[in-house]
Amino acid sequence: MKFFVDTAEIDAIAELNDLGMVDGVTTNPSLIKKSGRDIIEVTKEICDLVDGPVSAEVTATDAETMIAEGRKLLEIADNITVKVPLTWDGLKACKTLTDDGHKVNVTLCFSANQALLAAKAGATFISPFIGRLDDVNLDGMDLIEDIRTVYDNYGFETEILAASIRTVNHILDSARIGADVITAPPAVIKSMVNHPLTDKGLDAFLADIKAAGIKIL
């Protein structure tokens, strides 16, 4: 499974990248706003930092302008993936850009119907939003499973990029079902290391080391 980091914070990306935990990055207008930086400037810095795909989202809602914005974003770096919303115009933009040989991430997916359309339009990635489905008392994992089944049935190459990740369980469940990629905030990825028994075991080891006067250096 590939790990993408869902942030525009350079230091957070760098920390995880140094550990080999970053296969790509996803951004959106809200994350860019939170960073307080120019979209082109911060996206370029992210692209210089990581080798994998960096999703940069268009801001337009009509296909023609989405395509123009996508081409502008593609000028930033070779590893840019253009991110478009799952609307009819977004699918038109996806088809045009992928036909030109570019990578496209179709975002804001909430149904397998939508995911099927995105795959037919040539999407590189489909981003189903797990957490937002959970917010309205639907099981986001059911959607991941439905998309996986449909894509496997017909051999679609579109990768399932599980998004709106809120918890470690979201990551693990996505992995169990067979999502190709997860994108999560740095804090959620880092929290995967935590377990109370690990802490308890380490405390016991440290107590024994102190009692025995063990030193390595």
Swiss-Prot record:
Briefly state the protein's biological role: Transaldolase is important for the balance of metabolites in the pentose-phosphate pathway.
Query: Pathway involvement?
Result: Carbohydrate degradation; pentose phosphate pathway; D-glyceraldehyde 3-phosphate and beta-D-fructose 6-phosphate from D-ribose 5-phosphate and D-xylulose 5-phosphate (non-oxidative stage): step 2/3
The UniProt GO MF terms for this protein read: aldehyde-lyase activity; transaldolase activity
Key words, A-Z: Cytoplasm, Pentose shunt, Schiff base, Transferase
Q: Does the keyword Cytoplasm apply?
A: yes
Q: What class of enzyme is it?
A: transferase
Q: What is this protein called?
A: Probable transaldolase
> Lineage of the source organism?
Bacteria, Pseudomonadati, Pseudomonadota, Alphaproteobacteria, Rhodobacterales
InterPro entries, alphabetized: Aldolase_TIM, TAL/FSA, Transaldolase_3B, Transaldolase_3B/F6P_aldolase, Transaldolase_AS, TSA/FSA_arc/bac
